[in-house]
């Protein structure tokens, strides 16, 4: 580049920086956090072009190498990336709610271990009621678009969120979608993991539903400070089916994970995350453009047809009933019905 070109670039650089700063500021201004807003600011939101994001994050054991809030950290990142994508659309705003740290069914329930350090789950009926209550509040205030971001994979958990969303649709005519319960985004993540591994690694990872190479890689990418270095020596707990995972999780000293975390890497996590996040955002934007999410396959529905999953889910619901009975008995004894 000649001296004249250098002078032109030098002169334009501050202008370009200013323009980029303005665009970034405008985008950030379109992402609102309800906890920071007053009554008039919330009332002024255009209901037809405001998307409410409800991030969640079950506190769930993830074995000896990952934090109990692993799902929550992923949901926080997904929420931010989705918000950024939505406000790129002219006229659209995002209203972000504080993360709700509640969920149904830790992976420990796969082995019928309903008490497990690190898991602090709520009952199916509780989670459904929480999100139905929020659906009522949002629907009564005229909001039309609500996305729930709650990556946890337990079928009962996803059914609770799906049912709350269906209630919102049927009662208020809007859209409240359990985005992470739709299969297209989940399948993209699983496919990416398979493509990243050698045949030998795929055999070692097996059918892994929790805290495996896949999830450990994602946490190494997102929150490496919270991943214990000992994952590199983690012995595999490999299954080929959900029935295998039940048998593994029932063993006395099961550590809380499946598959082979030792295969994980931050580089793999970056690839997995980017592919999954891109597909997740793509599906959300398609829904805003008119795609009927109720015609898409849902994790909670598909797993009903798998006998091993049904066994786990039914046992979990029976445990829920037992817990509810204990609580109700105490309330009756205190005259608090």
Could you tell me what each predicted segment is?
Residues 1-9:
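N-terminal secretory signal peptides that target proteins for export/translocation
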Residues 5, 17-20, 38:
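Intrinsically disordered/low-complexity terminal segments and short unstructured peptides
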Residues 10-24:
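Bacterial N-terminal signal peptides
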Residues 28-146, 151-337:
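Extended, histidine- and acidic-residue-enriched regions that form the cofactor-binding/catalytic faces
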């Amino acid at each position: 580049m000649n001296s004249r070109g250098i002078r032109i670039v030098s002169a334009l650089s501050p202008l370009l920086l200013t323009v980029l700063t303005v665009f970034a500021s405008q985008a950030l201004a379109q992402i609102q956090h309800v906890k920071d807003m007053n009554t008039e600011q919330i009332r002024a939101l255009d209901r037809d072009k405001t998307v409410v994001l409800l991030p969640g994050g079950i506190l769930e054991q993830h074995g000896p190498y990952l934090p109990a809030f692993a799902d929550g950290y992923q949901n926080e990142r997904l929420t931010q990336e989705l918000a950024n994508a939505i406000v790129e659309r002219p006229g659209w705003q995002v209203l972000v709610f504080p993360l709700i740290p509640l969920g149904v069914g830790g992976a420990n329930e796969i082995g019928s271990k309903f008490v497990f350090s690190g898991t602090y789950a709520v009952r199916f009926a509780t989670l459904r009621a929480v999100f139905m209550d929020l659906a009522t509040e949002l629907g009564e205030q005229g909001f039309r678009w609500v996305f729930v971001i709650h990556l946890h994979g337990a079928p009962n958990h996803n059914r609770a969120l799906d049912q709350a969303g269906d209630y919102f649709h049927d009662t208020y005519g809007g859209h409240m979608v359990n985005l992470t319960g739709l299969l297209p985004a989940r399948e993209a993540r699983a496919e990416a993991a398979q493509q990243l591994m050698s045949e030998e690694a795929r055999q070692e990872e097996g059918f892994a539903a929790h805290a495996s190479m896949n999830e450990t890689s994602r946490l190494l990418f997102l929150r490496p400070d919270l991943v214990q270095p000992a994952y590199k020596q983690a012995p595999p707990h490999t299954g080929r089916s959900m029935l295998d995972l039940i048998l593994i999780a029932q063993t006395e000293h099961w550590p809380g994970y499946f598959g082979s975390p030792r295969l994980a890497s931050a580089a793999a996590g970056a690839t997995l995350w980017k592919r999954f996040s891109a597909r997740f955002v793509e599906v959300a934007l398609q829904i805003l453009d008119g795609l009927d999410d109720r015609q898409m396959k849902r994790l909670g529905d598909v797993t009903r047809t798998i006998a091993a999953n049904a066994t786990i889910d039914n046992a979990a619901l029976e445990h829920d009933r037992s817990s509810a009975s204990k609580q109700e008995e105490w309330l009756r004894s205190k005259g608090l019905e």
